[in-house]
Amino acid sequence: EYDDMYTEKRPKVYAFGL
């Protein structure tokens, strides 16, 4: 799950792989 790492630099949308 990238939610934890991506949400820090990118919006929640990117966390899912969009």
Curated annotation (Swiss-Prot):
It is found in: Secreted. Keywords: Amidation, Neuropeptide, Secreted. Its main location: secreted. The keyword Secreted applies. The keyword Chaperone does not apply. The modification Leucine amide is found at L18. One of its GO terms (cellular component) is extracellular region. One of its GO terms (biological process) is neuropeptide signaling pathway. May act as a neurotransmitter or neuromodulator. Belongs to the allatostatin family. This is Carcinustatin-13. It comes from Carcinus maenas (Common shore crab).
